[in-house]
């Protein structure tokens, strides 16, 4: 389960996880001193939401800019094991092509846990989402291939499939070029 409160009739549901982390920016410049070209490198540090772990061990100044080494929860995409159009099942190759993801509004969901705060379309694991600290995590969701009309999400998504029939399955069709 991607999240106990998030379930919907869609082909795919994606959980996108970001962590607030230190990021190092390197700026180099060359100058001439006593007839020799020298290079000066300046490092600056700021914090950003990132979906990948930023390894702070390689920073020029790691002290005071240390990031966690792992995320408590990972990004993940769940895909329905069986997808039908009419009486035909889509092959895995066709299901893979359904990737027009739309952001899922979390407005009508409750905060799932005392340690989790919902702000906008994110769940935050943070003391205060307005003022995040390094190591705080936020999670958003998106979906693709809405399979039926939904009062909150709108009409079912229209998917155009060019395929070949094999029994009760639709499989990718390719022309000889």
Tell me what each language-model feature is.
Residues 7-177:
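Charged, low-complexity helical/coil segments in non-catalytic cytosolic or luminal regions
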């Amino acid at each position: 389960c991607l999240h106990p409160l998030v379930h919907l009739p869609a082909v795919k549901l994606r959980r996108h996880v970001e962590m607030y982390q230190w990021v190092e920016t390197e700026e180099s410049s060359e100058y001439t001193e006593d007839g020799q070209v020298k290079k000066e490198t300046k490092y600056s540090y700021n914090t950003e939401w990132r979906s990948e772990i930023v390894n702070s061990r390689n920073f020029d100044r790691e002290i005071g800019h240390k990031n966690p080494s792992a995320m408590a929860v990972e990004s993940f995409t769940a895909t329905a094991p069986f997808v039908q159009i009419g009486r035909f099942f889509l092959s895995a190759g066709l299901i893979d092509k359904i990737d027009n993801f739309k952001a899922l509004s979390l407005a009508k969901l409750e905060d799932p846990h005392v340690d989790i705060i919902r702000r906008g379309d994110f769940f935050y694991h943070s003391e205060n989402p307005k003022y995040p600290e390094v190591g705080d995590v936020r999670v958003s969701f998106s979906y693709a291939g809405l399979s039926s009309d939904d009062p909150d999400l709108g009409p079912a998504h229209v998917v155009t499939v060019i395929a070949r029939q094999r029994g009760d399955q639709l499989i990718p069709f390719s022309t000889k070029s």
